[in-house]
C-alpha cells in the first residue's frame, strides 16, 4: 500500500509543481534563463547524492532543519524525522519531490512552447479569461506530453531505490519500505526466495507500466 501511496503522491506533486513552474517560465520574465538554470540544479545532482545530503539536513540531532527550528522564537521542539509519525513518510516524499520537479518542468515547458500563440490571442478576443484559456487551450494542448511524463514518472518513482534507502532505509520497522527496498532488505537477510519473488512482482508491474506507456505514446497513435 505504501508503495502505491509513495508513487501517486510523488508523481502528483511532481506534475503540479512542474506545471506551475513551466507556466511561469513560459512568460517573458526578466532573468528567466538564470531562474531556469537554478531550477535544474536538483535534476543535475545524482539522486543518491541528493538523498544523502537531505538525510543530513533532516538528522534529528545535528540536522540543519532542526537547528533552524530550535533557533526560532517560540516553543519549537526538535522533530524526530526518522521515527515520528507522519514525518518518516513525509520526509522522503519531500526529498523526491525536490529532485523530480525539474524533469516535469522541462518536459511541460517544451509542451507549452509548442502550443500556437494565436489560439490564446483568439481566446482573448472572444473575452476568455486567463483561467478559462488555461483549461480550454493549455491543458488540452499538454495532453500528450502530460500522459507521457506522468507514466514515466510512475515508472521511475515506483522503482526508485536511492531516496528511500539513503534517507529512512525503510524504517522505522520497515514502514517506509517500498517494494524495491524491501526486496533488497530481504536479500541482505539471506531470504533469497522471497527476494526473487519480489523481484518478479516488481518486474511484472514495470512491464505493465511499460506497455501502457508504449500504447499511449505519440508514436503508437
Go through each PLM region and give its residues:
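A structural signal for multi-pass alpha-helical bundles of membrane permease subunits
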Residues: 1-221
Amino acid at each position: 500500500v505504501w508503495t502505491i501511496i509513495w508513487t501517486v503522491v510523488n508523481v502528483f506533486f511532481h506534475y503540479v509543481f512542474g506545471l506551475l513552474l513551466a507556466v511561469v517560465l513560459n512568460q517573458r520574465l526578466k532573468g528567466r534563463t538564470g531562474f531556469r538554470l537554478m531550477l535544474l540544479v536538483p535534476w543535475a545532482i545524482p539522486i543518491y547524492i541528493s538523498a544523502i545530503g537531505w538525510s543530513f539536513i533532516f538528522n534529528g540531532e545535528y540536522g540543519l532543519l532542526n537547528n533552524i527550528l530550535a533557533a526560532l522564537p517560540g516553543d519549537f521542539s526538535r522533530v524526530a524525522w526518522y521515527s515520528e509519525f507522519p514525518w518518516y513518510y513525509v520526509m522522503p516524499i519531500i526529498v523526491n519531490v525536490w529532485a523530480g520537479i525539474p524533469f516535469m518542468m522541462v518536459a511541460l515547458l517544451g509542451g507549452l512552447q509548442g502550443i500556437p500563440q494565436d489560439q490564446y490571442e483568439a481566446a482573448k478576443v472572444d473575452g476568455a479569461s486567463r483561467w478559462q484559456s488555461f483549461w480550454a487551450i493549455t491543458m488540452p494542448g499538454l495532453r500528450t506530453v502530460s500522459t507521457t511524463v506522468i507514466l514515466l514518472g510512475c515508472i521511475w518513482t515506483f522503482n526508485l531505490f536511492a531516496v528511500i534507502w539513503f534517507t529512512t532505509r525503510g524504517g522505522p520497522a520497515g514502514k517506509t519500505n517500498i517494494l524495491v527496498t524491501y526486496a533488497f532488505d530481504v536479500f541482505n537477510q539471506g531470504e533469497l526466495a522471497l527476494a526473487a519473488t519480489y523481484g518478479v512482482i516488481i518486474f511484472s508491474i514495470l512491464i505493465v507500466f511499460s506497455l501502457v506507456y508504449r500504447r499511449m505514446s505519440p508514436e503508437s497513435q
